Structures are given as C-alpha cells and as structure tokens.
Curated annotation (Swiss-Prot):
SMART domains: EFh (SM00054). InterPro entries: EF-hand-dom_pair (IPR011992), EF_Hand_1_Ca_BS (IPR018247), EF_hand_dom (IPR002048), Recoverin (IPR028846). The gene is GUCA1B. It is a lipid-anchor. Residues 19-54, 56-91, 92-127, 145-180 form the EF-hand domain. In the retina, expressed in rod and cone photoreceptor cells. Appears to be more abundant in rods. It holds the Pfam family EF-hand_7. Ca(2+) 3 binds at D158, N160, D162, Q164, E169. It comes from Bos taurus. This is Guanylyl cyclase-activating protein 2. Ca(2+) 1 binds at D69, N71, D73, T75, E80. GO terms for cellular component: cone photoreceptor outer segment; photoreceptor inner segment; plasma membrane.
C-alpha cells in the first residue's frame, strides 16, 4: 500500500462502517507505525494483538489470520484489517456468523468438514483450558469432548447429511438452536476475542 490512505478506496472495499474519515486516518497512521510496509504478516499479526506465545493461542489466531486475509496472499493490508473489524465489531449476527464460518473453513472450499470443525473446536478447548475457563465444569464431567461437540453439531446442522456444513446450514443452524450457536462460537467468538485483544494492544 502507499503512504496515503484513500477514503474513497475504503468505501469501495466496504471497509468503512461507523468509523468516520478522521478515525480511519488515525487508525491508518498507527497501523503504519506498527507495520511500515503497510501489510501484516502472521508474526506481526500475533504481535499486533498481543497474542501469548503458546500453542493454544497460536492455533486459534492462525485461523483468525486466514479470515482477515480475504485475498489469500498470506498478508493483511489495512483495508482487509478495517473491513474485518467493522464486520465483526459492528456487523449483524448474520455477518458475524458468516465471518466465523470463514475461520472454520480452513481450505476455503465453501464447506466445513468434520476435521475442520474438530480442529477449531479442539484449539478453542485448549485455549480455554489454558485460560482456566470452564475447568470446574470439566471436573464435574459436564463438558462435552470436542468429538462429542462435533458429532452433535453435525447431527443438528447437516441437513442433507453429506458430511459437510454449507454456509447456509452453518448460519441457519446457529440461528435455530441456542446450543449450536454457543458451540459454534464456543464463548470465544471472534468479536469478543478481537475486542479483548484490542484493549490489550496500545494500537487503538
């Protein structure tokens, strides 16, 4: 990217929402202070959001990075960054679910298979355990295993029984069933995670 942020370009790419021009210019200034090249690589993304250097956090954040990286070039530019923030922080429930779907859809083929779902559920379980979340529930034997969560989600959401979750099945299944909504977001949904990490970061 160049050293000037274009308000018109941001509008064309859907990066603007409730943020005004002055706020976006300030974000861009701070973004370039942290990333002079104008793009974030994976290691910079982790530093940007103050991600702990452990396996549990890394797995989840790498999935988050892929969702930010809309063009698949393994970097995040400012427009991708702001567009994602506006979507997950200010978007509708449907928008947030669609974005969460992108995190699960590791190979970007438009469907989520059992292994993709299991990988994310396992990484979030590990991250929550590392943060001592729901330890008491697990000790009491009330917490489902990742495999049990995946089996139940597919039973409730995979309407055509093809072993994959389409975007429509994912969104409608979450809307239809509160348990599915909770499990797909795992109480660690992208919106709340990003909000927490942004508060930890001095960037915004």
């Amino acid at each position: 990217m160049g050293q000037q942020f274009s308000w018109e370009e941001a509008e064309e790419n859907g990066a603007v929402g409730a943020a005004d021009a002055a706020q976006l210019q300030e974000w861009y200034k701070k973004f370039l202070e942290e990333c002079p090249s104008g793009t974030l690589f994976m290691h910079e993304f982790k530093r940007f959001f103050k991600v702990p250097d452990n396996e549990e956090a890394t797995q989840y954040v790498e999935a988050m990075f892929r969702a930010f990286d809309t063009n698949g070039d393994n970097t995040i530019d400012f427009l991708e960054y702001v567009a994602a923030l506006n979507l997950v922080l200010r978007g509708t429930l449907e928008h947030k679910l669609k974005w969460t779907f992108k995190i699960y859809d590791k190979d970007r083929n438009g469907c989520i298979d059992r292994q993709e779902l299991l990988d994310i559920v396992e990484s979030i379980y590990k991250l929550k355990k590392a943060c001592s979340v729901e330890v008491e529930a697990e000790q009491q034997g009330k917490l489902l295993t990742p495999e049990e969560v995946v089996d139940r989600i597919f039973l409730l959401v995979d309407e055509n029984g093809d072993g994959q979750l389409s975007l429509n099945e994912f969104v409608e299944g979450a809307r239809r069933d509160k348990w599915v909504m909770k499990m797909l977001q795992m109480d660690l949904n992208p919106s709340s995670w990003i909000s927490q990490q942004r508060r930890k970061s001095a960037m915004f």
